[in-house]
Amino acid sequence: MKQLIHNDWWEVLKPQFESAYYAQLHNFLKEEYTHQTIYPEMHHIFEAFEWTPFSKVKVVILGQDPYHGPNQAHGCSFSVLPGVPVPPSLQNIYKELQSDLGCTPVNHGYLKKWADQGVLLLNSVLTVRAGQAYSHRGHGWEQLTDAAIHALSERPKPVVFILWGRAARNKKQLINTKTNIVLESAHPSPLSANRGFFGSRPFSKTNEALQAMGEQPIDWQLPAEPNYR
């Protein structure tokens, strides 16, 4: 079969791509991309995996499904393409980053610098219809992304999992909490950020955990201009 991810994730996830449920998902997506407006564009679907190879993952920030507005989604949780206004949840992430570590907020939402350092920006569902949040839930993506979470959890090198909001926190059951670090809080959405996201200090806690593992901490400060490289 055609190789869909061009790094070590391919071998990790190949059994999923060869499964019956993925064949059904593939057929569903062919129909959807033919007859509907679907985000992200097809070539961006697996961008989170492309940007952060399995062996390089230090941190996972788990999202739900892609942004469903024009030109926003590009396959990575919370990140948006350059030239698009920073969405409200990401604005709140920047506020927490500033109060936690003193990072200066930037006026773009392109999180590639994080991904390049080992932060896997993973949504549990990888596609969505334009303007219809959660419209591709229950078609198979969850099985594939659950398999990715479980594979990381069982890897000898531990991972810091950042779970914001109920949907992400429900994934905790997939994670071996004896060997990995799990940081949980409310979602950064304006609807819930004041109920435990603000003040949760996930970025400094992540770096403390990484340093305790003997890993390099993440430089969370994003560049003023988006880095396309």
Swiss-Prot record:
Belongs to the uracil-DNA glycosylase (UDG) superfamily. UNG family. This is Uracil-DNA glycosylase. The lineage of its organism: Bacteria, Bacillati, Bacillota, Bacilli, Lactobacillales. The keyword Oxidoreductase does not apply. NCBIfam families: PRK05254.1-1, PRK05254.1-2, PRK05254.1-4, PRK05254.1-5, ung. Its EC number is 3.2.2.27. Its main location: cytoplasm. Excises uracil residues from the DNA which can arise as a result of misincorporation of dUMP residues by DNA polymerase or due to deamination of cytosine. The active site is at D65 (proton acceptor). The keyword DNA repair applies. It holds the Pfam family UDG. It is found in: Cytoplasm. InterPro entries: UDG_fam1 (IPR002043), Ura-DNA_Glyclase_AS (IPR018085), Uracil-DNA_glycosylase-like (IPR005122), Uracil-DNA_glycosylase-like_sf (IPR036895). One of its GO terms (cellular component) is cytoplasm. SUPFAM superfamilies: Uracil-DNA glycosylase-like. It is an enzyme of class 3 (hydrolase). GO terms for biological process: base-excision repair, AP site formation via deaminated base removal. It catalyses: Hydrolyzes single-stranded DNA or mismatched double-stranded DNA and polynucleotides, releasing free uracil. Keywords: Cytoplasm, DNA damage, DNA repair, Hydrolase. GO terms for molecular function: uracil DNA N-glycosylase activity.
